[in-house]
């Protein structure tokens, strides 16, 4: 279980991507292009927080490997049509496994 964000947090997660986490657990990824891949030893910068909802911006093309690994509080993910690649284990060990938006024709659902 991660920490709850007591204040808003933000940073970078790709060459042209930024992330922003609200204190109520909504993570928004914005910008254009590819997200970095992460690993067991180099977790995503939001990995220590309880992410409840994830909104991925319309110009993002790749969800990085292990980007949301072990996000056990995650209940909703929005994947836009611009996403053409989802990295290995991107949503591995997430409790949530049933609510992915249908805005993306390639990934109308994700095997989590």
Please annotate each region the language model reported.
Residues 4-9:
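Boundary at the C-terminal end of the N-terminal hydrophobic targeting segment
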Residues 12-14, 20, 34-49, 55-56, ...:
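A composition-driven surface/loop motif
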Residues 26-32, 49-62, 72-85, 94-112:
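Structural signature of tandem-repeat unit edges
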